[in-house]
Amino acid sequence: MNVKPATAKISSHALKQNLEIIKQKAPNSKIIAVVKANAYGHGVVFVASTLEQNVDCFGVARLEEALALRSNGITKPILLLEGFFNEQDLPILAVNNIETVVHNHEQLDALKRANLPSPIKVWLKIDTGMHRLGVALDEVDYFYQELKKLPQIQPHLGFVSHFSRADELESDYTQLQINRFLSVTKDKQGERTIAASGGILFWPKSHLECIRPGIIMYGISPTDTIGKEFGLTPVMNLTSSLIAVRHHKQGDPVGYGGIWTSPRDTKIGVVAMGYGDGYPRDVPEGTPVYLNGRLVPIVGRVSMDMLTVDLGADSQDLVGDEVILWGKELPIETVAKFTGILSYELITKLTPRVITEYVD
């Protein structure tokens, strides 16, 4: 018997392949590769090391993420997409060549007070319609002029904004955001970025000087389609194994609460994967996994360490057989549709108990 527990297999080849497709979409744009949240659950050091020679900058959400990259030998510029949180962190940014977004008056005032060993690169975040972070359109000129005065920052500002509906192709709101962004930056020097994954795929006029690929870099669609439709390949294959195959009689319940009873005699497979590994607990009955060339449905309640699947009465599956929870054979977008949970959330919720294997 050879049983392998929950394992995320991360492919450097797929990662590089996806980056090439992204470059084909926006050949004249620099790439800010978004690796926040442990590179969307894929391993931030591995992803950054794999891509460093082929991107211009990395985007993260927290200073700790940026410092982890620096301590592991990553030398390309790193951008704090939410900006700095504490004034005392500004010298750390300067020493480590970490760039920052500025999106409010508090950050501007902190920069004015800062005593830095060297100037830092600043990107002015502009609220073009997301209404989450960013300075208002009528404040852009003020912030621009104030920032340009400061010896604490490098002379060429960047400009950044974010779409709220890039995946809604029938909406004119994204075009409105593009127009607003172009309008408030047209007479100002500096690189601009507004296109994240949805903008890269669907709004070519938004590509500008820099793009910020996130979820598509990992082979996952930002819409309700699948990445394969855009030529993307899943970077992660999440697998586990059957740890038991049981004969199951018609009418017998399975698992906690007995919420599923079999309508016929069948075989039940027990998979070493549960919510303790980050797989959702409340998945609907029938959510598929991939096993021996076919999809089989989850039945019963997902528990902390295991889930159960209906193999069928005539199945030949054996203990130790590999089960794919999502990946090339079963797109995570399909699992997302069944569960009602975004692919973004599924991919970032895996726990440290899941073994990570990095492959070519």
Swiss-Prot record:
On this chain, the residues bearing N6-(pyridoxal phosphate)lysine are 36
EC number(s) given by UniProt: 5.1.1.1
Keywords in alphabetical order, please.
Answer: Isomerase, Pyridoxal phosphate
Task: Locate the residues binding substrate.
Answer: 132, 304
Spell out the Gene3D superfamilies in the cross-references.
Alanine racemase (3.20.20.10), Lyase, Ornithine Decarboxylase, Chain A, domain 1 (2.40.37.10)
Q: A single GO BP annotation from the record?
A: D-alanine biosynthetic process
Please give the cofactor(s) recorded in the UniProt entry for this protein. pyridoxal 5'-phosphate
Which reactions is this enzyme annotated as catalysing?
L-alanine = D-alanine
Q: List cellular component terms (GO).
A: cytosol
Query: According to its UniProt record, which residues of this chain constitute the active site?
Result: 36, 256
State a single Gene Ontology molecular function: pyridoxal phosphate binding
Pathway, according to UniProt? Amino-acid biosynthesis; D-alanine biosynthesis; D-alanine from L-alanine: step 1/1
Q: Describe the function of this protein.
A: Catalyzes the interconversion of L-alanine and D-alanine. May also act on other amino acids.
Family per record:
Belongs to the alanine racemase family.
* Family annotation (HAMAP family): Ala_racemase
Identify the NCBIfam families for this entry: alr
What is the name of the protein in this document? Alanine racemase
Name of the gene this protein is made from: alr
